[in-house]
């Protein structure tokens, strides 16, 4: 796994750019190798679950996290393009309430590592997008939490062309001021 690791303004959140080998036939890249991932990032956490989601244009999912059994997520897009966001919700962190966003797509092949202690969300920019993500803990619906996507406490600059398509759960997300967050 040949990978450029890009630090972000949020400690622990990484953008990963794989080396892609391409020619007239197509392309190849190693999307995950546990040993190389640990060597290059310093993260030696086992992944226990892979998830695959598909979303239509304008769908906004988030901002999600699990308050117990928190999940680190390694995210990549295999179809289309999304604007992917991580928000620091660790109250003791110097970057508490800060966010980072980047475009992930099947074209740029970038990946984002979001460690436990962060909320995650994304907006689908293309007609459809499919996301694959690995998690460091199992899905536990009883611990799932949601912070409202447009909370002014964050001021996330979503690249929206109108109102997003939201699930009932995401419409009912808490404000940061009322949300259960990490110490």
Which residue ranges define each predicted feature?
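Non-catalytic, conserved peripheral segments adjacent to functional cores
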Residues: 1-107, 128, 135-183
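Conserved metal-binding segment of the jelly-roll/cupin
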Residues: 104-127
């Amino acid at each position: 796994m040949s990978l450029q690791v890009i630090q972000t303004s949020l400690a622990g959140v990484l953008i990963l750019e794989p080396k892609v080998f391409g020619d007239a036939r197509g392309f190849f890249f190693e999307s995950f190798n546990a040993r190389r991932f640990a060597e290059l990032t310093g993260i030696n956490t086992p992944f226990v679950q892979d998830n695959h989601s598909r979303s239509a244009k304008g769908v906004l999912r988030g901002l999600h996290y699990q308050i117990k059994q928190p999940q680190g997520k390694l995210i990549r897009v295999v179809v289309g393009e999304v604007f992917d966001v991580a928000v620091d919700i660790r109250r003791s962190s110097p970057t508490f309430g800060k966010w980072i966003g980047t475009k992930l797509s099947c074209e740029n092949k970038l990946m984002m590592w979001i460690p436990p202690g962060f909320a995650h969300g994304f907006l689908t920019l293309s007609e459809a997008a499919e996301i694959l993500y690995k998690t460091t803990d199992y899905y536990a619906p009883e611990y799932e939490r949601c912070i409202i996507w447009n909370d002014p406490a964050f001021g996330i600059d979503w690249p929206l062309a109108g109102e997003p398509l939201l699930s009932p759960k995401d419409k009912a997300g808490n404000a940061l001021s009322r949300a259960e967050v990490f110490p």
